[in-house]
Amino acid sequence: MNFQAVLFDCDGVLVDSEAITCGVLRDMFEEQGWRMSLQECMQRFVGHTVKSQRVLIEANTGVPLTDEWLQQFFERRNVQLEQRISAIDDVHDAVQHLSEKCNGRIAVASGADRYKVEMMLRKVGLHDFFAGRIFSGHEMPRSKPHPDVYLAAAAYLQVDPASCLVIEDTPVGIAAGVAAGAEVWAYAQPPAAHQPLMHAGAKRVFTSMATLRLS
């Protein structure tokens, strides 16, 4: 298929951020008496917004999930990301290749807040590829797994969502891309399992950004 545009998720696709974010989340849950490993935290929360998991969090901490707590989480998370964020291996070449193939019609469509996304992309030298074409699920009526952020990105690029390629790394994000009508390829950073990604609707799973190419 000749794709007219490529829409990227951010966390876990462009930047290696998910373990950093979940490390902060795990520490803050432990302060409230809910203990889990980093791996358990990632299994529960990667691909989801914290607010969307309110019922689960309150059931396990016994404490209301307040706006003040969320703000503290965002602040602590941002400090760690600014200090430790890195790009996914080989992603700069992949993004440049896809931008050239699609005549610059590439965008970021993230479930995360805009400040976080733009800060991370600047830190790793990817922001210029996407300047003016960064979309946040926090600014949409609904976030992933709903398709709103992908539909907004496609509309801005003036392309049919069905002619877009979406690059994702979680079942929740894949579901959003599929719901938008796009074809979804999933990046599975080893040792991530492939089956949940295929089950969610990914047409292809790849394990290295060096192989993300269009003919």
Predicted segments with their positions:
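Asp-based, Mg2+/Mn2+-dependent phosphohydrolase catalytic module
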Residues: M1-Q4, Q96, D113-S215
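Active-site neighborhood of HAD-like aspartate-dependent phosphohydrolases
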Residues: M1-Q43
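Short, acidic loop-to-helix structural element flanking the phosphoryl-transfer center
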Residues: N2, V79-V108, R114-E118
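Conserved SAM-binding loop
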Residues: L14, A87, I106, V166-I167, ...
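Short beta->alpha linker loops
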Residues: I20, F45, T49, S86-D90, ...
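Anion (oxyanion) recognition and catalysis
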Residues: E30, S99-E100, V178
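A metal-dependent, Asp-based hydrolase signature
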Residues: V46-V79, H97
